[in-house]
């Protein structure tokens, strides 16, 4: 029979395993990458706190900077050279291209912020430069999804992109009139549900602070407090240890963003 102490120890072990995994990865990381990540994350945090507590900036300044910093952190934290079994230096060219293209995308939006404020979606025609930026943006986001999330989501995105392009050739119920390539890029980049739409706005205004708070809370011992609270709520009930594990993991997930990872 699992005791209450065993349930508490298991919940703490799950939390520590994730921290140990990250700590091990950072320890084995080359120093230049480690310090680059440290500097970037500090700059990112200061930038986010500034626009939240001091002075909000133009959306076309905030969103591209948020996106660029996130992408560069992904490329440094998950380099392609470590994903491949062979340590081929040519993979670094791909990572350098991704970092450079992320910065180019950010520069484009920052330098055209004023014009973009007056741009009318579905009315203004996409310029050649905008199409190129949109293509680079889609490549960067899809590669970030592939490295950080999963290949399954990557292929789901590929499927729907292919459907948007080839849907006009599909017979039957799923056929539609089709969409031009520049128009598709406009929807993906400028659309309300596109890359610079509500998903990125939510990440900028809510998700980032949620994750930062959860990290500080857990590293300051807050996870143990939530686990103790879960134990107290269920210690006198039938199946108390199991309930304590679920309650504690749910409470911890509310601030860490990973409830499922803590329930096992």
Where does each model-flagged region fall?
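Conserved, well-structured core domains of diverse proteins
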Residues: 1-124, 131-135
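A generic structural signal for ordered alpha-helices
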Residues: 14-28, 85, 123, 140, ...
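Generic amphipathic alpha-helical segments used as scaffolds and interaction surfaces in large
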Residues: 30-33, 123, 145, 200, ...
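Structural signal for alpha-helical transmembrane segments and their membrane-water exit/capping regions
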Residues: 46-54, 73-82, 102-117, 125-133, ...
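Membrane-embedded alpha-helical segments and adjacent helix-loop junctions characteristic
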Residues: 117-118, 138, 158, 166-264
């Amino acid at each position: 029979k699992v005791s209450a102490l065993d349930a508490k120890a298991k919940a703490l072990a799950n939390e520590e395993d994730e921290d140990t995994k990250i700590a091990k990865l950072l320890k084995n990381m080359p120093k230049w990458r480690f310090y680059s990540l440290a500097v970037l994350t500090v700059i990112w945090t200061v930038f986010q706190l500034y626009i939240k507590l001091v002075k909000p900036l133009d959306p076309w300044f905030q969103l591209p900077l948020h996106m660029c910093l996130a992408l560069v952190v992904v490329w440094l934290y998950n380099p392609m050279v470590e994903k491949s079994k062979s340590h081929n230096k040519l993979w670094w060219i791909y990572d350098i291209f991704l970092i450079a293209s992320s910065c180019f995308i950010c520069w484009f939006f920052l330098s055209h912020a004023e014009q973009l404020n007056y741009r009318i979606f579905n009315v203004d025609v996409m310029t050649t430069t905008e199409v190129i930026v949109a293509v680079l943006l889609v490549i960067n986001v899809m590669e970030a999804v592939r490295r950080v999330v999963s290949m399954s989501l990557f292929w789901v995105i590929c499927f729907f992109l292919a459907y948007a392009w080839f849907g006009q050739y599909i017979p039957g119920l799923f056929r539609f009139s089709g969409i031009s390539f520049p128009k598709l890029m406009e929807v993906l980049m400028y659309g309300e549900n596109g890359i610079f739409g509500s998903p990125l706005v939510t990440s900028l205004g809510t998700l980032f602070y949620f994750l930062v708070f959860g990290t500080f809370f857990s590293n300051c011992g807050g996870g143990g407090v939530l686990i103790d609270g879960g134990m107290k709520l269920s210690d006198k009930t039938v199946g108390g240890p199991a309930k304590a594990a679920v309650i504690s993991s749910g409470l911890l997930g509310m601030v860490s963003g990973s409830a499922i990872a803590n329930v096992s």
